[in-house]
Amino acid sequence: MEFVTLGTAGGPVPLKHRAQPAHAVIYGKRTILVDCGDGAMGQLMRAGIDFRHVNEIIISHHHFDHIGGLYNCLGINMMLQRKSPLKIYGPPGTSEIIRGLMESCNVPRATGFGIPGQTLPHPNEFVEVYDLLPEHTLNFDDLRISFCENTHYRVEEDFGKPGPISLSMRFDTETRSIVYTGDTGPCEKLEQFSYFADLLVAPLMDAEKIMHKVRTKNPHMSEERLNMMAKHMAKHFLTAGQLGDLANVSKVGHVVAVHIPLDYINQKTVPDYIKQISLKFSGKVTIAEDLDRF
């Protein structure tokens, strides 16, 4: 089983050298797209993966940087006359999003290629969509995928209550375990969920540096708005030290940091962030680039 980091950026701001969040889990002949940020179809092709061979997509949560490529995915498969099922999974609300995107395909489908009598399949003919809860599991041959809620949206005390949820996911085979946390803050449930995983893929955030840049670039932003953003950055993501703590407590083998916003993590600063993680975790640490394979 292999994990490919298709897009390692984070947040809504496009970056020059990192694509929006999307990854691929490859097991045998099966390729599962995990999150589908803007540009995911192109990143698949750059990784040598034919997007037409992707039959499953799993979404961790519904922030735009993780779902911005879904419409393109539907449209390209429609234009290329897809016939095989495309199954899309995600937290509650996923089916509503996909239904809306499929409805918006009506006009481009009717337009087609401008050839009289020519027809295209509608995405509702090949797309199957399923809303997931943390207790659900997916099984594809001997690949088992399990889920747990994380703290990207709310504190653990609110787990199980009505409201939006953000999911982490674990991929288990007989020989390897991979945990993709998606976006999350510190979370005890996630620590337990990640026990003894061979690979832990998780976000890396430096809230202080991000907020400094936000204030510099937006001098007229209200203090209320700035405080709201600062709270989101601090509570709903992981710092280098917190990522090290998660990896240490979970006893994982290898940490891969993704979801890197702005440009403060670069070739010059990567060693420092690896050092911060390694102060808490003695295993292997990698800060991923697009198209890395693990």
Regions found by a protein language model. Name each.
Residues 1-179, 185, 192, 267-294:
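Binuclear metal-dependent hydrolase catalytic cores
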Residues 166, 175-179, 185-284, 288-289:
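Cap/insert and terminal regions of metallo-dependent hydrolase folds
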